[in-house]
Amino acid sequence: MKKRKFFFTGVIALVLAFAFIACDQDKKCNNKHQATDYSVSDNWLKIPTVKHQVDVFYLYPTCWDPTDADGLVNTIDNASMRAKAPRVYDEQASCFEGVANVYAPFYRQLNAMKSLSYSLEEQEQLVADVPYHDALDAFNYYLEHYNNNRPFILAGH
């Protein structure tokens, strides 16, 4: 189980490396040290009723429209993200629902447009910040509380 957890933690890190990069080093990322509580069902976009023998753990792409007032990392209750994420889920992940139990957490995201102004080295250093930890915490919570040793697929955009 530990090897499987370690392997999939690495896979999630790679997915996040491509999807969510950068945080302004001159400013602290908001919510940096506050973990999202994934025992709260409102912090999940999708928690299915188990009907299938396999699960999908899905991470949607950046789904918020940052404003200057938002900062570099959105909050877990960001209205823009919570409005867009279900639509993106319907377009990208609902196709799995006929064959799998699809789990999708809400997670804080970095401002993707600002990330373009950073060097790759800076981006790599910043990847392990808030969004990575939210996704990893959600994945670990899923494994410990929802998965029940079913096989699973990691899906993301």
Predicted regions mapped to residue ranges:
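Conserved alpha/beta-hydrolase "nucleophile elbow" surrounding the catalytic nucleophile
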Residues: 156-157
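Active-site catalytic motif of lipid deacylating hydrolases and related acyltransferases
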Residues: 61-152
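Hydrophobic membrane-insertion alpha-helices, especially the h-region
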Residues: 13-17
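C-terminal motif of bacterial Sec signal peptides marking the signal peptidase cleavage site
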Residues: 19-22
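N-terminal extension/subdomain marker
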Residues: 26-86
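Bacterial N-terminal signal peptides that target proteins for export
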Residues: 2-10
